[in-house]
């Protein structure tokens, strides 16, 4: 049993969940870091942060986060959570979280009505790539998953103002909708507390959308090179097989 496990009561209480940060690294020098409710509170937070030797000895936030939305009967349920200027939290997707654990990989369980969806994140050991596996554990009607990437492309110690290409792929063929706009006024509370610059605007180019069936898993990949999407499930299973289960403080 995982000792890094938090229930709904803690996860929906942002005074308890927001201060809890999670850092994952790999052998290529990339990292993923955010809070356990996937709300970035520092400029260094990001879903995929990588070294770019051509731009100096620093890390660069490529993919800040993803906004996932579950659709049932045409109704959207946004699982994302961000803090905007003035301390405004939106869209409050943390209220759907039922459990978070980190026994082998970070795993968040969401419940939206009759839908139970899990999200697991894992780094590929020797490459600048993160995989996210979405599994629809329960559903009583047709369900659609929409994934909206929020891009930064900046130094991890700077704010957004010759980068590598970022390849975003799915294990199944998604529908892409080009819907470009800026998300304005992200606020990083830890930087605010430190008295350093703490707000920025981030670019959203559009969104991916694909149906997901009960018992089905869909894998999202973000990396600096393109891969064969059909290999993503095997890539995920190979990576998770070498992970150590975190069942105590000592392992």
Task: Identify the meaning behind each predicted range.
Residues 1-250:
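Terminal accessory carbohydrate-recognition/targeting modules of carbohydrate-active enzymes
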């Amino acid at each position: 049993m995982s000792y890094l496990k938090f229930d709904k009561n803690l996860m929906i209480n942002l005074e308890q969940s927001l201060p809890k940060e999670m850092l994952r690294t790999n052998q290529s020098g990339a990292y993923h870091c955010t809070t356990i409710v996937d709300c970035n509170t520092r400029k260094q937070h990001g879903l995929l942060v990588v070294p770019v030797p051509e731009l100096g000895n620093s890390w660069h936030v490529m993919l800040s986060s993803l906004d996932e939305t579950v659709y049932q009967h045409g109704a959207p349920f946004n699982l994302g959570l961000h803090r905007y200027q003035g301390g405004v939290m939106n869209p409050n997707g943390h209220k759907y979280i039922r459990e978070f654990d980190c026994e082998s990989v970070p795993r968040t369980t969401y419940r939206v009505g009759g839908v139970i969806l899990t999200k697991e994140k894992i780094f590929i050991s020797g490459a600048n790539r993160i995989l996210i596996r979405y599994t629809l554990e329960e559903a009583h009607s047709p369900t659609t998953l929409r994934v909206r990437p929020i891009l930064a492309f900046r130094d991890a110690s700077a704010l957004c103002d010759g980068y590598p290409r970022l390849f975003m792929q799915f294990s199944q063929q998604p529908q892409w909708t080009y819907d470009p706009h800026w998300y304005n006024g992200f606020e990083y509370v830890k930087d605010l507390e430190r008295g350093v610059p703490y707000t920025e605007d981030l670019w959203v180019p559009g969104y991916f959308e694909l149906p997901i069936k009960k018992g089905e898993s869909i894998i999202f990949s973000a990396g600096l090179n393109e891969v064969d999407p059909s290999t993503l499930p095997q890539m995920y299973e190979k990576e998770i097989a070498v992970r150590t289960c975190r069942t105590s403080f000592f392992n």
